[in-house]
Amino acid sequence: MSTESMIRDVELAEEALPKKTGGPQGSRRCLFLSLFSFLLVAGATTLFCLLHFGVIGPQREEFPKDPSLISPLAQAVRSSSRTPSDKPVAHVVANPQAEGQLQWLNRRANALLANGVELRDNQLVVPSEGLYLIYSQVLFKGQGCPSTHVLLTHTISRIAVSYQTKVNLLSAIKSPCQRETPEGAEAKPWYEPIYLGGVFQLEKGDRLSAEINLPDYLDFAESGQVYFGIIAL
């Protein structure tokens, strides 16, 4: 009921009462009705304001109404957090002792293979069909720039059970050097990270690999800088 309706009801009630002139009883009744009307209007106005400005009422978790405002990775993480924990997941890290190659390891404190995912021949084997978030990061490090142009590549590939051909799913190329370090000049260090990530429909038995072209430039100074993984959505 609106505030205006309440005021009209009170006024009609006052008009319906028998009017008495003079005397202390009539004065007390008028005072009582005036006080009651004021409290009723004040209470209704306060309730209306509280409801209107959302001070009271049901609390709802607010998210952007437009799904496009939420990043794909955020949507994937939110969806995964609401599902059972028996979905396939893997996170493997690079072996810092493997010289001249990028070798993935799962028997480490910061690595994980769960719910059917296997690491076989340096590839992740998908245990079941579905949508997967695939990701990988590498970090390159060098000292100075040689005369030959340095091109660093990082690629995630898939060999499907339906067709035994390697197909690139994600790939990136970076060049850390714009020009050669002049002779006699100080060779300054450079760093180049490359991150890849995307969502793909995979089949049971698919094999996934994450590879680079120049493993000698990999930086293993800190644990967890080079990794590869999948998460079933």
UniProtKB/Swiss-Prot annotation:
Give the Gene Ontology MF terms in alphabetical order: cytokine activity; tumor necrosis factor receptor binding
Q: Which GO terms describe its cellular component?
A: cell surface; extracellular space; plasma membrane
Report if keyword Membrane is assigned. yes
- How does this chain sit within the bilayer? Single-pass type II membrane protein
Q: Where is this site: Cleavage?
A: 34-35, 39-40, 49-52, 76-77
Quick one: where is this thing mainly located? membrane
Q: Which residues form the THD domain?
A: 88-233
After translation, the protein is modified as follows:
The soluble form derives from the membrane form by proteolytic processing. The membrane-bound form is further proteolytically processed by SPPL2A or SPPL2B through regulated intramembrane proteolysis producing TNF intracellular domains (ICD1 and ICD2) released in the cytosol and TNF C-domain 1 and C-domain 2 secreted into the extracellular space.
Which residues does the record list as Phosphoserine (modified residue)? 2
Q: Lipid (N6-myristoyl lysine) linked to which residue positions? A: 19-20
Q: Which residues are glycosylated?
A: 80
- The residue ranges crossing the membrane are 36-56
Query: Pfam families from the entry?
Result: TNF (PF00229)
Family in the record: Belongs to the tumor necrosis factor family.
Q: What does this protein do?
A: Cytokine that binds to TNFRSF1A/TNFR1 and TNFRSF1B/TNFBR. It is mainly secreted by macrophages and can induce cell death of certain tumor cell lines. It is potent pyrogen causing fever by direct action or by stimulation of interleukin-1 secretion and is implicated in the induction of cachexia, Under certain conditions it can stimulate cell proliferation and induce cell differentiation. Induces insulin resistance in adipocytes via inhibition of insulin-induced IRS1 tyrosine phosphorylation and insulin-induced glucose uptake. The TNF intracellular domain (ICD) form induces IL12 production in dendritic cells.
State whether it acts alone or in a complex, and with which partners, per the record: Homotrimer. Interacts with SPPL2B.
UniProt protein name: Tumor necrosis factor
Q: Which organism is it from?
A: Papio sp.
